[in-house]
Swiss-Prot record:
InterPro entries: CAT-like_dom_sf, Plant_Fungal_Acyltransferase, Tri101-like_N. One of its GO terms (molecular function) is acyltransferase activity, transferring groups other than amino-acyl groups. O-acetyltransferase; part of the gene cluster that mediates the biosynthesis of PR-toxin, a bicyclic sesquiterpene belonging to the eremophilane class and acting as a mycotoxin. The first step of the pathway is catalyzed by the aristolochene synthase which performs the cyclization of trans,trans-farnesyl diphosphate (FPP) to the bicyclic sesquiterpene aristolochene. Following the formation of aristolochene, the non-oxygenated aristolochene is converted to the trioxygenated intermediate eremofortin B, via 7-epi-neopetasone. The keyword Transmembrane helix does not apply. Keywords: Acyltransferase, Transferase. Belongs to the fumigaclavine B O-acetyltransferase family. Pathway: Sesquiterpene biosynthesis. The gene is ORF8. It comes from Penicillium roqueforti (strain FM164). It holds the Pfam family TRI-like_N. This is Eremophilane O-acetyltransferase ORF8.
């Protein structure tokens, strides 16, 4: 079973993240005859989960007058208790904008460009009429069910969201007995709901901002602006409209077989004696190369300005590195930057192993407990959460790769619903990111969101499509 921490308080890392919602979709075949019983199962189970962990019914508030620091986050939990209600959305009626059957979507591999967040999600990515920490919407289509889970990113990272969904499945599966269940021991958060390593108030007694602010690596690992070139800021708080991307982006999904991944790893073996890269390092290097070629075609021939740099940013879960309990659902996310000249990344003459070993070296260097504690120290001592800016330009010379390979969605049992058939994110959910999905039947899928011209160029790249199948 997937236990959750008993209490929840916002951490230094939570406060560094932009205030927006993101959505996960879990897809199941469900006949129309079972809709009523399925709806009852879902609501009963979510109510049971909310009763078990009332902080899941809470809302996020930013305190601009806090004695801790300006913009300190507060979690308001309703008292008396308020239930967490599912939004049930019937998309099978004759007047519905939704036309696809579940079988139609299944036959085409459940492509994300057909999964419109405006129809399926209780909260569109980045835009909210609420500050709830999470919301759930159950969408019934002909022959199936698409459950949308929306989470506030200040509240939870991908691992934590997966943990909450997994605990929800425990309730659906009937394996949780609230009357006789014991709270998890040793989750490291006690009644304060936060591990000491992440507590803003404790960290401010250990670190000083002026001792840390001159180290660009600490800023990078927080994904905060350090180069002085990026003026983009997220809205101060939701509800707020995000800037419209011009030109707009489109989502595409690609699949890599286990044989394709093995061949990419073989291509990416470094020339240095004794050097080693993982399959993930090799895949990141491969994606970085071909994404930059799609955005900057002249990088193939090293014709970009020689001083133009590119970054690939890999999201790292720091729980193991910081010895934080797996029951902890808050953000424990670090951002590992590898930078190279863009001509080197895109060049036909650059060995893939030279890129992959750089990725491996920066990841290895980042997984240092002393370093990560200082990164959290910078996050805790920053004087104003509202003045921070973010460090990468993901639609330009940078690529952000986040891997959800370890999320348990395909392992979960949902009682009468069985196992999850598809895990997806809605169309354009993470603009400009490259998201690696949990593997299914030995196949790894990833979703990219790119400008349309760049996406077309990627799909026509013969070297890329030799290994990647477009969905």
């Amino acid at each position: 079973m997937y236990e959750l921490q008993q209490h929840r308080k916002f951490s230094a890392l939570d406060e560094m993240l932009p205030a927006f919602y993101y959505c996960y979709l879990l897809c199941f075949p469900v006949s129309s005859d079972n809709r009523a019983s399925t709806s009852e199962l879902l609501q009963t189970s979510l109510s049971s989960l909310a009763e078990e962990r009332p902080y899941l019914t809470g809302t996020v508030r930013r305190d601009m007058e806090s004695s801790v620091r300006k913009g300190h986050l507060i979690l308001d939990i309703p008292n008396p208790f308020e239930d967490l209600r599912i939004v049930f959305n019937d998309l099978t009626g004759p007047k519905s904008q939704w036309k696809e059957t579940y079988q139609d979507l299944k036959d085409t591999g459940m492509p994300p460009h057909k999964l419109d967040a405006n129809l399926l999600a209780p909260l569109t990515a980045g835009i909210g009429e609420t500050r709830k920490v999470m919301s759930v919407q159950a969408n019934f289509i002909h022959g199936g069910l698409l459950i949308a889970f929306c989470f506030h990113h200040n509240f939870v990272d991908a691992y934590g969201a997966g943990r909450i969904i997994a605990r929800f499945s425990d309730h659906c599966n009937g394996t949780v007995d609230l009357k006789n269940s014991a709270d998890p021991e040793g989750d490291g958060t006690d009644s304060r709901g936060i591990a000491d390593l992440l507590d803003v108030e404790l960290l401010k007694k250990q670190y000083k901002f002026e001792d840390l602010e001159s180290d660009p690596n600490l800023w990078r690992l927080n994904c905060l602006e350090f180069r002085g070139v990026n003026d983009f800021r997220w809205p101060d708080f939701i509800p707020a409209l995000l800037p419209v991307r011009k030109p707009p982006v489109i989502s595409s999904m690609f699949s890599f077989s286990s044989d394709a991944l093995a061949e990419i790893k073989a291509m990416a073996q470094p020339n240095q004696s004794g050097a080693w890269v993982s399959t993930n390092d090799a895949l990141v290097a491969f994606l970085w190369r071909h994404t930059m070629r799609a955005r900057f075609p002249s990088s193939r021939t090293e014709s970009e300005p020689p001083n133009r740099k590119s970054n690939v940013v890999v999201a790292l879960d720091g729980r193991k590195d910081l010895s934080i309990s797996p029951t902890y659902i808050g953000n424990c996310l670090f951002h590992c930057f590898t930078d190279l000249p863009i001509n080197m990344v895109g060049s036909e003459s650059t060995h893939l192993g030279d890129i992959a070993i750089k990725v491996r070296q920066t990841i290895t260097a980042a997984r240092n407990k002393t370093l990560l504690k200082a990164v959290v120290g910078l996050a805790a001592t920053h004087p104003d959460c509202q003045t921070i800016k973010y460090a990468n330009d993901n639609l330009g010379p940078d690529l952000y790769v986040t891997s959800w390979i370890d999320l348990p969605f395909y392992k979960l049992e949902w009682g009468p619903l069985g196992k999850t058939e598809f895990f997806r994110i809605p169309d354009r959910q993470f603009e400009s990111l490259c998201c690696i999905l949990p593997p299914k039947d030995g196949v790894v899928q990833l979703i990219t969101s790119m400008e349309e011209d760049h996406s077309k160029r990627l799909r026509s790249d013969a070297e890329f499509t030799r290994f990647a199948t477009y969905r």
